[in-house]
Design a protein with these regions (language model features):
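Conserved AMP-binding A3 loop
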Residues: 1-16
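Short beta-strand->loop structural element characteristic of the AMP-binding/adenylate-forming
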Residues: 3-5, 32, 54-60, 131
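Conserved AMP-binding/adenylation subdomain of ANL enzymes
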Residues: 12-29, 37-77, 91
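Gly/Ser/Thr-rich phosphate-binding loop
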Residues: 75-80, 89-152, 164
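AMP-binding/adenylate-forming catalytic core of the ANL superfamily
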Residues: 78, 183, 189, 209-255
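Glycine-centered tight turns that cap/initiate beta-strands
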Residues: 102, 162, 249-252
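Active-site glycine-centered loops adjacent to acidic/histidine catalytic or metal-binding residues
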Residues: 110, 135, 157, 208, ...
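Conserved ATP/PPi-binding loop(s) of AMP-dependent carboxylate-activating enzymes
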Residues: 158-162, 170-201, 233-235
Length: 255
């Protein structure tokens, strides 16, 4: 494990970015069924404190409790991991999902958010949006994605304001390669290390594989270390998982 020193300036930068991009305000009631020991939950806490909204901390991610809390506290935003949101939308009793309909925002963070879950959430919300962001503890909230385009439903979005992202590979082209990030959201070095092998000229080497489309939207294809070479062909496990996951009768898949 590596220690990641988080600076005040990087927290301030990321917090202001998410507040501006997703229009958080003092009028929001933010439901947070996430541990504050993780950067996702802690980042949501920072955002609520920054805008002066009401924050409801929930000690578990039980789907029934989440739905009850939304109704009880008139929550306007919900932050949860993809697996929790998938469990909520898989509820066979559609009427029980009514509390979700009044949310203005559902936010998650993940390299992969199942498209079927996104579609179900969007169908339930009246006027609200579903969003995600991509980032690491070392480079928080590097991209943002608001799911309003079916063609981009598997993307993690465009680079956040003030953040640079590039694709680095052996050919020095921008097709598929390791995702490098640069910006105020990126750490200087790991704990007790003057030099980091993960940094190059202020760029953070994330270890994630990705590509940009023609519109500048980023797609995550997996991890550099997970890349499989079959008869000279590069195979990305996450691409296999995405294809198999949409087949009927498949609930979970690991490649």
């Amino acid at each position: 494990p590596k220690g990641v020193p988080i600076t005040h300036s990087s927290c301030d930068f990321s917090t202001k970015n998410i507040a501006k991009t997703l229009q958080y305000s003092k009028n929001d009631v933010d439901l947070l069924p996430l541990p504050l020991s993780h950067s996702f939950g802690l980042g949501c806490l920072h955002t609520s404190l920054y805008v002066g909204s009401t924050l409801v901390l929930q000690k578990n991610s039980n789907t029934t409790d989440i739905l009850n809390s939304i109704k009880k506290y008139n929550a306007t935003t919900l932050a949860a991991i993809p697996s929790t949101l998938s469990k909520i939308t898989s509820n066979s009793h559609t009427d029980s999902l009514d509390p979700l309909s009044n949310l203005r925002l559902i936010i998650t963070n993940s390299t992969f958010f199942p498209p079927e879950t996104i579609r179900k959430l969007k169908s339930i919300l009246k006027t609200g949006i579903v969003a995600t962001y991509y980032g690491l503890t070392e480079a928080s909230r590097s991209t943002f994605m608001i799911f309003d385009d079916e063609e981009k439903i598997e993307s993690v979005g465009r680079p956040s304001e003030g953040v640079q992202i590039k694709i680095q590979n052996e050919n020095n082209d921008d097709k598929i390669g390791e995702i490098w990030v640069k910006g105020q959201n990126v750490i200087n070095n790991y704990w007790k290390k003057e030099y980091s092998e993960n940094k190059s000229d202020e760029w953070l080497k994330t270890g994630d594989l990705g590509r940009f489309d023609d519109d500048g939207f980023l797609y995550i294809l997996g991890r550099v270390d997970d890349l499989i070479n079959i008869s000279g062909e590069k195979v990305y496990p996450q691409e296999i998982e995405r294809i198999v996951k949409v087949l009927s009768g498949i609930d979970e898949v690991v490649a």
